[in-house]
């Protein structure tokens, strides 16, 4: 029986490499979203801390400069939060896009693998059929040989 050789092996490797690249880009996008979520949580915590400090200072005696300084810190944190939220939204859109790209590349790769499997099955079926036919021919020839020898 001849061994099976997949003639599209180079295509299979190419599809696999493209799938792996798409997967690593998708994983990078997930990490970026997680990093930005952490950054956003930290910024909100800082904003809350400044806000709490400002409220404490307003209850007791305070100087106008202190409150003004705290207000500017609060404004800066608000701006930072807005910036991070925008970056997070963009990163999530990129993540969704890269996920779709990965799923597409994965589907293409799996289609080539399925084709290889079908061709392998067809090859083995064909080789098995050839062997069966050869065995039948040998059995038929032996039968005829024995028959001829008996008649002679």
What are these regions (language model features)?
Residues 1-152:
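Charge-rich amphipathic alpha-helical interaction elements
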């Amino acid at each position: 029986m001849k061994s099976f050789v997949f003639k599209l092996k180079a295509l299979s490797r190419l599809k696999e490499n493209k799938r792996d690249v798409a997967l690593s880009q998708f994983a990078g996008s997930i990490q970026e979203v997680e990093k930005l979520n952490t950054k956003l949580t930290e910024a909100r915590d800082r904003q809350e801390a400044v806000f709490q400090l400002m409220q404490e200072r307003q209850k007791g005696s305070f100087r106008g400069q202190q409150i003004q300084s705290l207000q500017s810190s609060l404004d800066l944190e608000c701006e930072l939060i807005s910036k991070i939220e925008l970056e997070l939204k963009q990163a999530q859109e990129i993540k969704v896009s890269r996920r779709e790209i990965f799923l597409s590349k994965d589907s293409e790769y799996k289609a080539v693998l399925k084709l290889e499997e079908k061709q392998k099955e067809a090859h083995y079926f064909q080789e098995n059929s050839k062997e069966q036919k050869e065995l039948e021919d040998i059995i038929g020839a032996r039968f005829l040989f024995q028959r001829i020898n008996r008649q002679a």
